[in-house]
Amino acid sequence: MASATAPAAAVPTLASPLEQLRHLAEELRLLLPRVRVGEAQETTEEFNREMFWRRLNEAAVTVSREATTLTIVFSQLPLPSPQETQKFCEQVHAAIKAFIAVYYLLPKDQGITLRKLVRGATLDIVDGMAQLMEVLSVTPTQSPENNDLISYNSVWVACQQMPQIPRDNKAAALLMLTKNVDFVKDAHEEMEQAVEECDPYSGLLNDTEENNSDNHNHEDDVLGFPSNQDLYWSEDDQELIIPCLALVRASKACLKKIRMLVAENGKKDQVAQLDDIVDISDEISPSVDDLALSIYPPMCHLTVRINSAKLVSVLKKALEITKASHVTPQPEDSWIPLLINAIDHCMNRIKELTQSELEL
């Protein structure tokens, strides 16, 4: 009886180079949710700040190098073989995983604000590398000119920014407070410009007038191009805008004062108090944006009142938290009642001007 010959083990067939890149992009994107919610790695070892930042920067350099290599080999023909591509993909995946592993070494007790900044940088690097994989997975004849280099550059920029990340929670808090000051400053300037011009949609209307000058008809009037009065402020609207602008100015003053106190009196080891200050300050800019958007016509006075009240609540909470923290020594807190009085004055005026809306 003839012995049966065992079948030879099947050799797995590698996917094409471009398919491997697409698969790697998917794998990298699956890492993003984990990074967003991932906790710091628990360890009994004392945190070594210098070693952490050195390892993080080295990991970023490795990711940047892999991005460079991949961009070069996949931006020209002939493409690498499936076996070569597999090796490239494994190196990229390993570099990204190594970077994420270093991020997880940053403990919470170093500050939530600092950890958020490092997490954001980590997400930028992972997402940038995934974008690069997706762009390079398009064949060179289909790829838009320089598109691969643009995506590669975004990864490179994210890696290059690692040394600029604040090294402690106080520096991280100052960075976030500065961003919030700038956001509120921009919103205030836009509001002031619109009020000075008395024409909030001037740019839009000018474009519309040019586009419709040759075919203006009755239908345009009905649709409001450009004569719809809903695009302009009434006298009552303009009167209400005045205390709203003052309230936004108070918001800017509040943030600038908080930033100054953190810069002058903030202590690096008081991470929890600094985090609390940043958390409440982060709510000011979105509240200012809501109020700014609500003043554009057609203006709903009740919405303006509600958004103003929300902003006032956030401002008072920010002042309360700042006053109770170590950044505000008691002799230096006299400015807080003055600012609260200014905020209350603005809100009371807004209430007066919108009272009729509540009586309808």
Swiss-Prot record:
The entry assigns this protein to a family as follows: Belongs to the CCNDBP1 family.
- What is the protein name for this chain? Cyclin-D1-binding protein 1
Which conditions up-regulate this protein? Expression is induced by sodium butyrate, an inhibitor of colon cancer cell proliferation.
Region Required for interaction with CCND1: start-end pairs: 2-208
Specify where the region named Interaction with RPLP0 lies, as residue ranges.
2-190, 240-360
Region described as Interaction with TCF3: 2-184, 150-360
Record PTM: Phosphorylated.
Subunit info? Interacts with CCND1 and GRAP2. May also interact with COPS5, RPLP0, SIRT6, SYF2 and TCF3.
Q: What is the lineage of its organism?
A: Eukaryota, Metazoa, Chordata, Craniata, Vertebrata
Q: Which organism is it from?
A: Homo sapiens
Q: Which residues carry this modification: N-acetylalanine?
A: 2
Q: What subcellular locations does the record give?
A: Cytoplasm; Nucleus
Role according to the record: May negatively regulate cell cycle progression. May act at least in part via inhibition of the cyclin-D1/CDK4 complex, thereby preventing phosphorylation of RB1 and blocking E2F-dependent transcription.
Which Pfam family, just one, is annotated for this protein?
GCIP_C
Keyword Phosphoprotein listed? The answer is yes
**Listed GO cellular component terms?**
cytoplasm; nuclear body; nucleoplasm; nucleus
Q: Which domain of life is it from?
A: Eukaryota
Summary of the tissues where the protein is detected: Ubiquitously expressed. Expression is down-regulated in a variety of tumor types including breast, colon, prostate and rectal tumors, and is up-regulated in certain hepatic carcinomas.
Q: Keywords, A to Z?
A: Acetylation, Cell cycle, Cytoplasm, Nucleus, Phosphoprotein
